[in-house]
């Protein structure tokens, strides 16, 4: 139970740190500090990934990788009415974002909240409110500020290219279920920290050297595209696919 509590605490902590692909420095800093507290050395790559080193009994090295970056959005343009047009970071299922809360993160790290909405948001006004296709081209972001023009938004410091983080809605139920956006793959990162905690707490020295790689660009296609040559074997820890004729369920661990 204590280990479960630790893993859930790590999960809640990193879920609270917004990290769409390309904006992962803060969550990597958290992971780095946690690894140091457990007594492990780390290294940041030029790409921004974090490597955590565990000494083993021989020279063979096994790598584990999980990604801490998530899907997200980005300001495409500021519209004349003070709302934001957006594009996607990675491949979010855009229709599910209608009505979701979000944060706009400026270059100066000022954070503004907002809501992702359809361009026909009110059933009482728009005849196509129910039927309009939800896509980046037919949706916008309403900022939680009094803004009525492009100039009003620019005065806030919001620019094209600013990151937009989607509310994770993280919930841990009394029955033990975890509901959240971006469990892919922050849940796996939390589990790997549970492994590190066990190794540290029980003073276990594994047979082989271990390198845990926390990657930062998986959702845009090149998370661990480079693996250091000293790693002989790599185990990727990520979410499994469920549905159609696939044999797995939410209660399984899939080994590929």
Placement of each model-derived feature along the sequence:
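N-terminal hydrophobic/helix-forming segments and targeting peptides
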Residues: 1-256
């Amino acid at each position: 139970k204590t280990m479960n509590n630790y893993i859930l605490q790590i999960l809640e902590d990193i879920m609270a740190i917004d990290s769409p692909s390309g904006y992962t420095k803060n969550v990597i800093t958290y992971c780095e500090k946690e690894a140091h507290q457990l007594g492990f050395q780390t290294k940041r790559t030029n790409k921004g990934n974090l490597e955590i080193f565990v000494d083993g009994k021989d020279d063979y090295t096994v790598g584990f990788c999980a990604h801490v970056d998530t899907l997200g959005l980005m300001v495409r343009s500021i519209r004349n009415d003070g709302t934001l047009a957006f594009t996607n970071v990675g491949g979010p299922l855009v229709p599910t974002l209608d009505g979701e809360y979000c944060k706009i993160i400026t270059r100066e790290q000022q954070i503004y909240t907002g809501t992702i909405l359809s361009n026909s948001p009110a059933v009482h006004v728009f005849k196509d409110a129910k039927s309009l296709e939800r896509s980046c081209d037919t949706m916008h972001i309403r900022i939680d500020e009094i803004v009525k023009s492009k100039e009003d938004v620019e005065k806030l410091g919001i620019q094209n290219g600013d990151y937009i983080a989607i509310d994770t809605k993280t919930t841990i139920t009394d029955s033990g279920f975890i509901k959240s956006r971006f469990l892919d793959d922050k849940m796996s990162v939390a589990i790997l920290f549970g492994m590190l905690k066990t190794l540290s707490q029980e003073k276990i020295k594994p047979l082989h050297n271990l390198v845990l790689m926390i990657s930062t660009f998986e959702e845009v296609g090149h998370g661990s595209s480079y693996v250091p040559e000293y790693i002989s074997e790599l185990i990727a820890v990520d979410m499994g696919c469920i549905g159609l004729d696939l044999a797995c369920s939410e209660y399984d661990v899939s080994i590929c």
